[in-house]
């Protein structure tokens, strides 16, 4: 095990499980370097080259989509508009990477006779189905990733060999928080703490190197209290900042100004805070021992049920995603997790005391990353990796073990 750099620690990822030297290298140098193919619950791969599905009589249409450098949510909205249906009638099994080539299924309620032309998008097939696409319909994703311009190929190979047998922590990856401006979890934590001043500081007074000049200037103005000037300076794509500033400029108190931000965005912040807390829990659990060896007091998943570990019970170690309705581990594991909550200043009851629409319920997540069909090939200074991950797990968590980036943004993360 090796200590992670400050950037990772700020996201709750305190460790690498591999004790190898940093390989360096760049991911996503082009979208074709990061290929994501959805794997359905029955094991069928929705391959870039096409897939055959068995149609069923019903009220939905499943569409095979291959997108390149296209945001999933924006694609769904555009498709809904083109087909004349509500965005609520368009669904996916999971959000795919934008800076990638991604092959997956989108479902639309009703029959679809023709599909629009959308730049960066190919439609390869359509099937009538008796149900919509949803997270329960997919197992996960198959990844084919090329790591370019590797500085130390020997370090990459050593790390990848170690990963074949290592119990890799199932952290929430960089993209959950952002690499240019990693503050979503800080905004969520401020909401949980009911601290509007902390929220304001995270949104406007934390300014990062790789932000655009316009964004930096606007944040500086906002941080100084020049709300109207900041509102005029922020480009229109900064929806949440502009919504917050608009109310501040109108004289709202800070908490009610925050509530002017669209609810779905505020919910993303709370979920990011839950993800950050999970990462910290996982780091604390790593300090107590390997993730594939349950300890007394651990929670384990056995046959789809979560129970406290007992000798001979077996199962996979799980940790709580903090929120209402979850159990905490017992013993020294539970003590370590409660210590994290105290350090972060988050009351376990805070998740239920949120305003309507923001109440956060907890869940359980496997501590160990479940990696399938793992292989790699070295081609000069490039390394190609192939593997399958269950939905909700992040490919970048595996890649960081080899690259070990001090500044993830510079490596394409």
Swiss-Prot record:
InterPro entries: PsdUridine_synth_cat_dom_sf, PsdUridine_synth_TruD, PsdUridine_synth_TruD_insert, TruD_catalytic. The keyword Ion transport does not apply. The keyword Metal-binding does not apply. Its EC number is 5.4.99.27. It catalyses: uridine(13) in tRNA = pseudouridine(13) in tRNA. One of its GO terms (biological process) is tRNA pseudouridine synthesis. It comes from the Archaea. One of its GO terms (molecular function) is RNA binding. Keywords: Isomerase, tRNA processing. The active site is at 97 (nucleophile). Gene3D superfamilies: 1.10.1510.30, 3.30.70.3160, TruD, catalytic domain. Pfam families: TruD. Residues 167-370 form the TRUD domain. It is an enzyme of class 5 (isomerase). NCBIfam families: tRNA_TruD_broad. Could be responsible for synthesis of pseudouridine from uracil-13 in transfer RNAs. Belongs to the pseudouridine synthase TruD family. This is Probable tRNA pseudouridine synthase D. It comes from Pyrobaculum arsenaticum (strain DSM 13514 / JCM 11321 / PZ6).
